[in-house]
């Protein structure tokens, strides 16, 4: 870690330089500069510097331990204890230190039955129908909450260290303290929290148990990340609204052909003639639950999950937009498989969406056959495409968003979408300035892909 720390100090004076050059331009990932055990340092640099983003890396994090008062121990509950929220009056105030910010909103704990059937399960049948309003759910007691946490922690398969009793106890304490931080919002534990926390814990773990300072830093990083993802993706109503308000719109702009065949189809009238208005026939939520709540932990190899999280933790873009654009980019990476599926002759007539959902829920297996899963440079290119889509979305440059995707598909897979074909037939009528911009965008994507192909062939 000292090597990458010294390299970063020599190259970046501020957090902003680390973000823009080191992460978004990919400098940290070149020439094996970035070691596997350096990510804990990087995440502390991103999240433990001051709010003005002018933290000097040469400070070496001295004095940046925001939660100075330690963690609250998990209560020992004897048989028959009826511990409820009234006992929280005796909780030491140190865990509610003002520097550990919280979000606003009321969440409900996943019901007991969700321990056996929750939406993050790999089982597709279990995932269907998993969304519930949550308004009628009865909040669980502390004992029930800790029992679910213990069960979830025992199932973590990210690394063998999570089977060690001391690590289990520390993870349990971290989750308990996270819930205490947000006790005024009535936030309660849900499946998925433990998996997000396990990734962060693992990055600060270097072969020995975490000391109290490390545990506090894990909690701060976890809390800041969850402040962004929990209100949107762990709240069923907000997730549905995000799908309609953000994801569906971006999906339709970037991949209109795929979108129309998978989710929207023109209904037929009684006479067999089609109406003019399309209608939504399938929901994205069956698979979006897992993709969003776990931030791609089940969809990508861990080393690429960590790269995505590096970009997430820069918070260059609001998380709801960044996640939507990341999903689109990942779908672009397997567009050939998706295109083959929806191009079947009878797909529109027999489409019940099962095949598409099955393919998406096995995304990791398909992705691992693609070049981007074997070449860090190509995966970093996908991250840059995500950033470009975010920028264009904010600028309302929807045509350029589609152009980037069409060009990527054409250059990588040789598939010409309807938009590429229509542009080729309309070249004479396109404004010259517009044509110049489109050519530059198309050439940039083409050169990037050709450069990566040359590297592989050498």
UniProtKB/Swiss-Prot annotation:
Residues 33-316 form the Rab-GAP TBC domain. The gene is GYP6. This is GTPase-activating protein GYP6. GO terms for molecular function: GTPase activator activity. InterPro entries: Rab-GAP-TBC_dom, Rab-GAP_TBC_sf. PANTHER family: TBC1 DOMAIN FAMILY MEMBER 5, TBC1 DOMAIN FAMILY MEMBER GTPASE-ACTIVATING PROTEIN. Its main location: cytoplasm. Residues 116-136 are annotated as: Disordered. Keywords: Cytoplasm, GTPase activation, Phosphoprotein. Gene3D superfamilies: putative rabgap domain of human tbc1 domain family member 14 like domains, Ypt/Rab-GAP domain of gyp1p, domain 3. One of its GO terms (cellular component) is endosome. Stimulates specifically the GTPase activity of YPT6. It is found in: Cytoplasm. The modification Phosphoserine is found at residue 436. Present with 2990 molecules/cell in log phase SD medium.
């Amino acid at each position: 870690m000292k090597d990458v720390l010294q390299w970063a100090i020599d190259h970046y004076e501020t957090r902003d330089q680390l973000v823009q050059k080191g992460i978004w331009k990919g400098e940290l990932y070149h020439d094996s500069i970035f070691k596997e055990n350096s990510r804990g340092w990087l995440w502390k640099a991103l999240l433990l510097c001051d709010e003005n983003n002018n933290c000097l890396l040469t400070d070496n994090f001295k004095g940046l331990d925001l939660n100075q008062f330690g963690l609250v121990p998990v209560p020992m509950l004897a048989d028959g204890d009826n511990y409820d929220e009234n006992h929280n009056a005796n909780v030491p105030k140190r865990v509610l230190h003002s520097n550990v910010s919280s979000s606003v909103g009321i969440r409900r704990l996943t019901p007991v039955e969700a321990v056996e059937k929750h939406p993050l399960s790999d089982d597709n049948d279990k995932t269907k129908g998993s969304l519930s309003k949550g308004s009628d759910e009865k909040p669980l007691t502390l004992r029930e909450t800790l029992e679910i946490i213990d069960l979830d922690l025992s199932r973590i398969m990210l690394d063998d260290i999570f089977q060690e009793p001391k690590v289990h106890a520390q993870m349990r304490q971290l989750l308990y303290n996270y819930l205490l931080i947000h006790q005024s919002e009535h936030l309660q534990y849900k499946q998925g929290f433990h998996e997000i926390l396990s990734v962060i814990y693992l990055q600060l773990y270097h072969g020995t148990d975490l000391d109290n300072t490390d545990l506090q830093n894990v909690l701060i990083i976890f809390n800041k990340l969850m402040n962004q993802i929990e209100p949107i993706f762990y709240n069923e109503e907000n997730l549905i609204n995000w799908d309609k308000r953000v994801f569906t719109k971006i999906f339709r702009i970037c991949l209109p052909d795929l979108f129309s065949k998978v989710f929207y189809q023109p209904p037929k009238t009684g006479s067999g003639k089609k109406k003019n208005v399309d209608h939504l026939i399938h929901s994205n939520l069956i698979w979006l639950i897992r993709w969003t709540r776990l931030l791609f932990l089940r969809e990508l190899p861990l080393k690429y999950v960590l790269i995505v999280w590096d970009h997430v933790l820069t918070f260059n873009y609001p998380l709801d937009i960044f996640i939507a654009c990341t999903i689109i980019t990942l779908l672009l990476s397997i567009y050939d498989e998706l295109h083959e599926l929806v191009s079947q002759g009878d797909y529109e007539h027999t489409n019940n969406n099962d095949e598409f959902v099955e393919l998406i829920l096995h995304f990791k297996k398909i992705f691992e056959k693609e070049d981007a899963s074997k070449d860090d440079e190509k995966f970093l290119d996908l991250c840059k495409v995500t950033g470009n889509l975010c920028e264009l979305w904010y600028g309302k440059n929807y045509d350029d968003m589609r152009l980037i995707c069409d060009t990527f598909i054409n250059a990588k897979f040789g598939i010409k979408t309807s938009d590429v074909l229509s542009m080729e037939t309309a070249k004479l009528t396109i404004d010259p300035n517009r044509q110049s911009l489109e050519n530059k965008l198309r050439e940039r994507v083409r050169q990037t892909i050709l450069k990566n192909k040359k590297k592989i062939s050498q």
